[in-house]
């Protein structure tokens, strides 16, 4: 229990230090904090249909994050929080790109169309509709 109290005091002292306050009020903190929206949105969209994925935008986001991942590492002082954000975004967008490729070029779209009946057949068999009259 004494170790926990010591750890708690160290954390509290660190959070109250001038260096921590300066870090939290800098762009090295807030830039990555807001940039986490990109990978979080990509992770959220992984459950959505692959029809909504834009191949061009996904490619652009992969290249953008790869370039800025290198920038975050090379800038002085190194911004490892931003680098982690861009690394996560590259991985998330790569998953989205693979879903896009499988759907449009791997036959996933054709299978989805084969499963769904055409709209005219669905309308004809909808409840409350009358069967077509036969010619006599």
From Swiss-Prot:
It catalyses: pyruvate(out) + H(+)(out) = pyruvate(in) + H(+)(in). Residues 111-136 are annotated as: Disordered. Pfam families: MPC. Residues 117-136 have a biased composition (Low complexity). GO terms for biological process: mitochondrial pyruvate transmembrane transport. Keywords: Membrane, Mitochondrion, Mitochondrion inner membrane, Transmembrane, Transmembrane helix, Transport. Residues 2-19, 75-136 are mitochondrial matrix. It is a multi-pass membrane protein. It is found in: Mitochondrion inner membrane. Coiled coil: none annotated. The chain crosses the membrane at residues 20-42, 52-74. Residues 43-51 are mother cell cytoplasmic. GO terms for molecular function: pyruvate transmembrane transporter activity. InterPro entries: MPC. GO terms for cellular component: mitochondrial inner membrane. Its main location: mitochondrion. Mediates the uptake of pyruvate into mitochondria. Belongs to the mitochondrial pyruvate carrier (MPC) (TC 2.A.105) family. This is Mitochondrial pyruvate carrier 1-like protein. It comes from Homo sapiens (Human).
